[in-house]
């Protein structure tokens, strides 16, 4: 019986385990430098010199705080970043196709076999057992290296690069969308707070008018009708104030969610009103549309996907071309036989190297259909690019016109508010002096409330139009949110 050689067996097993562990560890190494093609963090493309703040400071939230929290904590940013990293890894897969593949196979097995022979000698039957034990150890290394594939790998690599560019552009677009939503939610909360302040002012004015009407009625100088009208106006003002308080709570929840927080998170924003910058976007509409067509991330992503689709056409065409590969192998087989009465041991080992040419000859005309499908996908993507260009130009046009209108209404709403305030002061004085009617006072009071709402809406619409124009240009950033 042949004794097994445990040292050699353990050495072979250890070598294979070491090789396997190194191969498994290599998959975590970015040998092709693909990580440099994606951002270092989910919010890095938008942050520039700013930094993420893990916790909000104990102070009123500024607009920049809300934006940073939104792009740093919102799960949509992490999802877009993960998609970009996944596509970068796919680029590494395509790069790896240019290197050879090496596979190892090894094993050991032991077989036992017993054969019983019987011979009948009349009254006596002779029985003999023959035992055979086979131990086999084998190992092999197989090498395969594609030398020429007539453009298949290069087309696949080009496709992966374009898809990575599209993923990066999509990440940029996601961050800009998050910034826009956070800024809009922040300004919406500020606008609802301003509307609440206006509602409280209207309530105080209505209460003052009610007090004056009641005093005149008690003194016998006013009518009960005037007092009831004043009381009705006051009740309406209270209803408007309560509704405004609900709008503030809703707007607070929207901002919290935009910042990646729970909707019930209490927030306190700064009340200081930023200066109105009328000089932004002073370029002509044609120049703005051209700028959007150059840099809008949606268009950048669409064009990259078009280039990837065209590269896929080349890759599909190359599948029908020959492939030339270098192949090689090293093998060893050491079976050992132990049987009665003798011992037999054999071993074999060999090596091979060669060049293999694979030529697709016929596959049922499937290659032509694959090329046609890939070309149709490229045509569809080209149509998507044209459609995206039209949508971008329309968004820029509408946002630009809205900004022009809302900018003009800033002065109009300011003048309207001033006139309404002076009208109320005059009507109140005339009513107290007994020369004016309560209807005149009530009309002036209503006009002031409307003017306050118009002013709040004018500022809100101007800021929203400015944000939308920046977003339609694909250039929204921390600076444009202000």
How would you label these PLM feature ranges?
Residues 48-59, 105-142, 271-282, 314, ...:
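Small/polar, glycine/serine/threonine/aspartate-rich low-complexity segments that form flexible
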Residues 68-78, 85-101, 129, 133, ...:
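A glycine-/polar-enriched beta->alpha junction
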Residues 11-20:
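Bacterial N-terminal signal peptides
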Residues 79-95, 174, 178-197, 208, ...:
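Amphipathic alpha-helical coiled-coil segments
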Residues 173-291, 402, 406, 448-449, ...:
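Periplasmic alpha-helical coiled-coil/stalk elements that build and connect Gram-negative outer-membrane
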């Amino acid at each position: 019986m042949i004794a097994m050689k445990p040292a050699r067996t353990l050495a072979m097993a250890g070598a294979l385990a070491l090789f396997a562990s190194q191969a498994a560890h290599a998959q975590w190494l970015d040998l092709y430098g693909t990580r440099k093609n994606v951002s270092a963090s989910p919010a890095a493309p938008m942050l520039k010199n700013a930094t993420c703040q893990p916790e909000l400071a104990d102070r009123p939230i500024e607009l920049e705080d809300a934006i940073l929290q939104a792009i740093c904590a919102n799960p949509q940013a992490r999802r877009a970043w993960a998609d970009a990293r996944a596509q970068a890894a796919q680029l590494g897969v395509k790069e790896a196709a240019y290197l050879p593949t090496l596979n190892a196979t090894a094993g050991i097995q032991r077989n036992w076999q017993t054969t019983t022979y019987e011979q009948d000698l009349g009254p006596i039957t002779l029985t003999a057992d023959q035992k055979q034990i086979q131990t086999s150890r084998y190992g092999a290394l197989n090498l395969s290296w594609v030398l020429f594939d007539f453009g298949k790998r290069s087309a696949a690599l080009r496709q992966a690069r374009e898809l990575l560019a599209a993923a990066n552009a999509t990440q940029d677009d996601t961050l800009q969308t998050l910034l826009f939503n956070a800024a809009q939610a922040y300004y919406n909360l500020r606008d609802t707070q301003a509307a609440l302040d206006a509602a409280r002012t209207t309530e105080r004015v209505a209460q003052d008018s009610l007090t004056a009407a009641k005093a005149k009625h008690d003194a016998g100088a006013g009518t009960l009708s005037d007092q009831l009208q004043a009381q009705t106006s006051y009740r309406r003002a209270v209803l408007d104030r309560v509704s405004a308080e609900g709008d503030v709570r809703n707007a607070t929840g929207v901002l919290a969610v935009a910042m990646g927080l729970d909707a019930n998170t209490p927030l306190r924003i700064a009340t200081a009103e930023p200066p109105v910058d009328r000089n932004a976007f002073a370029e002509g509409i044609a120049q703005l549309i051209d700028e959007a067509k150059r840099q809008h991330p949606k268009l950048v992503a669409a064009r990259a996907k078009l280039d990837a689709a065209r590269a896929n056409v080349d890759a599909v065409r190359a599948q029908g071309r020959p492939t030339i590969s270098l192949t090689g192998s090293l093998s060893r087989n050491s079976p050992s036989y132990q049987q009665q009465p003798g011992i037999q041991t054999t071993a074999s080992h060999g090596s091979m190297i060669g060049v293999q040419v694979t030529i697709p000859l016929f596959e049922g005309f499937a290659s032509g259909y694959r090329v046609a499908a890939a070309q149709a996908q490229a045509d569809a993507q080209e149509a998507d690019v044209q459609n995206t260009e039209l949508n971008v130009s329309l968004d820029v046009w509408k946002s630009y016109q809205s900004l022009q209108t809302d900018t003009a209404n800033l002065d109009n709403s300011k003048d309207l508010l001033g006139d309404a305030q002076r009208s109320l002061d005059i009507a109140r004085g005339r009513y107290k002096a007994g020369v004016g009617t309560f209807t005149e006072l009530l009309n002036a009071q209503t006009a002031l409330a409307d003017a306050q709402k118009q002013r709040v809406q004018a500022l809100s619409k101007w800021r929203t139009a400015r944000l939308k124009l920046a977003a339609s240009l694909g250039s929204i950033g921390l600076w444009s949110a202000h």
